[in-house]
Amino acid sequence: LAGSKHKEEKADLDPSNPVANWIHARSTRKKRCPYTKYQTLELEKEFLFNMYLTRDRRYEVARVLNLTERQVKIWFQNRRMKMKKMNKEKTDKEQS
């Protein structure tokens, strides 16, 4: 069943029309849902407590905030990168 659906989607793609393929890919993608203020606040509090989550803690945070574990994992990855960037900018500013 799943395989037949995948074949149907492939049939919709037209190698001679990359723009149509791009539009099709964009329309089938999951809509971006920003986090609520409450979710962001709770994720930030958790991040201040610990920059890295165990699998069990990630499951708990996701359950409490009504997010997927993947969303929590990626939020933490992005937050660590943001912190790394902020620290780099701070040290660059201090050195100049």
UniProtKB/Swiss-Prot annotation:
CDD domains: homeodomain. InterPro entries: Abd-B_homeobox_TF, HD, HD_metazoa, Homeobox_CS, Homeodomain-like_sf. Signal peptide: none annotated. GO terms for biological process: anterior/posterior pattern specification; embryonic skeletal system morphogenesis; proximal/distal pattern formation. One of its GO terms (molecular function) is RNA polymerase II cis-regulatory region sequence-specific DNA binding. It is found in: Nucleus. Belongs to the Abd-B homeobox family. Interacts with Geminin/GMNN, which inhibits transcriptional activity. This is Homeobox protein Hox-C9. The gene is HOXC9.
